[in-house]
Amino acid sequence: NIARWTEGILSWEKEFPWSEMETDNEQRRLRELKKIAAVNLKKTSGGHTSNNGEIYRAAVDHHVIIKEQIDLYKADFIICCGTEYAFMDVCYKDREVDWKMTSRGIWYFRDGKSVVISFSHPEARVKEAYLFYALTDAVKEIMRCEEFEEQL
């Protein structure tokens, strides 16, 4: 899912039919994943499911490293995959942010040149197409709003 998301986000002006997105996954992974950085808030391995309390405590315990990583990457997009509360308390604890909601209910805010989006985990038990289109539609709306605001 992350490779699909990357392609959809970085090519947000393009329309992607699902028949195209559900195939060629190995080539997509090779092509797209080198364009991104993934940051785990919990810095130690665990099982295939996550405990939000453990993730939160781990993020707070490693807040210096996490903040340094985020600052180093200077990301265009930061997708919080179910971890926005821990992320906010680690990276934006003493800052006011202006959360906005897309027309389809995806929360986000702008931090300088970065867009921070609160979203689901890529392995959520939801159809992959639902996750892909929910996220890429949100990015399209955000980018179109940003383009409009820049023209004013």
Residue ranges, per PLM feature:
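C-terminal capping/extension of enzyme domains
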Residues: 53-67, 86-152
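A polyanion-binding, active-site-adjacent surface
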Residues: 1-73, 77, 83-85
